[in-house]
């Protein structure tokens, strides 16, 4: 296996991350990603737009909130509208009129989310389209080819994804296959000077398999690494231990992207564990259920208690929704057939995530991150000592106590 890395690592990958500050107690770090469409401050939360758009928010609004990188989905974009059409629009940036950075996933996650429509072999993943029923093969080469056509700033290797609750030989098979597919992705990548290919660490909840994957993949000189195969139903205790194992063995000078994580507590804890980048559909999805994210958790604005509440969602939030609209107004909209409330809540929830990560970053730079964590947990749970046990244990493992 080690021999396969030699050819794949012939050309030195660009260094796209500059560390600005590090927490002296935990593994938390603040940095900058130097990408083709501008600098991105880290830690960073990246909103998810499956098909070249966010649900409930425009690119102009996303820009105004300060978002400098968001996600697109290779599998869905590859099927519809298709890479050929997007390429004619000067890539995904031109197609969606987005002036900042884009990260496209490889399509591998659809092995889990569309498991009834997919079949995995060494060749790749054979899908049956949810749109027209036609069969298509997504190989490592095809995934990279589509992402090269899309022109995203960060592209992801195709990995063999299994649910985090799966155990046994399938997990080992997927881990080793992901290493082989990484080499095929590196070989197929036509634009390494303009698009940064990230590897994805697999291995499920097996520490030995994760360690093997980390050892092999870090031999490949790629610009960054993602931690995959988590946030899929495993216990939080299992989750944080796999994250901590991964960050302890990933290169310090390269970005660490924890895939599929978006709950506020998870973000803060995983920054402490050493992660730099996060994505999740949670803030937009929860908005569609009438839920607004706030420092104390969330507000279910459909509830009658908000019917005559004329305050903003969050008095400290600077987003357009909080500046212009009351809880009572949003409550009324949610009980009508008007979809505007979902739009307003999406704007707020994404703003909340971005503002949270900005505050986390500032606390790292100002060398007060442990105090920030205690204040955050105190607001979220009423008292930092009432924080969930898994989070307390995870933070203690990197030197942050909540008592």
Swiss-Prot record:
The active site is at residues 105, 279. It is a peripheral membrane protein. One of its GO terms (molecular function) is tRNA-guanosine(34) queuine transglycosylase activity. Catalytic subunit of the queuine tRNA-ribosyltransferase (TGT) that catalyzes the base-exchange of a guanine (G) residue with queuine (Q) at position 34 (anticodon wobble position) in tRNAs with GU(N) anticodons (tRNA-Asp, -Asn, -His and -Tyr), resulting in the hypermodified nucleoside queuosine (7-(((4,5-cis-dihydroxy-2-cyclopenten-1-yl)amino)methyl)-7-deazaguanosine). Catalysis occurs through a double-displacement mechanism. The nucleophile active site attacks the C1' of nucleotide 34 to detach the guanine base from the RNA, forming a covalent enzyme-RNA intermediate. The lineage of its organism: Eukaryota, Metazoa, Chordata, Craniata, Vertebrata. It holds the Pfam family TGT. The keyword Transferase applies. HAMAP family: Q_tRNA_Tgt. It comes from the Eukaryota. Its cofactor is Zn(2+). Residues 260-266, 284-288 are annotated as: RNA binding. The modification Phosphoserine is found at residue 139. This is Queuine tRNA-ribosyltransferase catalytic subunit 1. One of its GO terms (biological process) is tRNA-guanine transglycosylation. Its EC number is 2.4.2.64. GO terms for cellular component: cytoplasmic side of mitochondrial outer membrane; mitochondrial outer membrane; mitochondrion; nucleus; transferase complex; tRNA-guanine transglycosylase complex. Heterodimer of a catalytic subunit QTRT1 and an accessory subunit QTRT2. Keywords: Acetylation, Cytoplasm, Glycosyltransferase, Membrane, Metal-binding, Mitochondrion, Mitochondrion outer membrane, Phosphoprotein, Transferase, tRNA processing, Zinc. The modification N-acetylalanine is found at residue 2. Queuine binds at residues 105, 159, 202, 229. Its main location: cytoplasm.
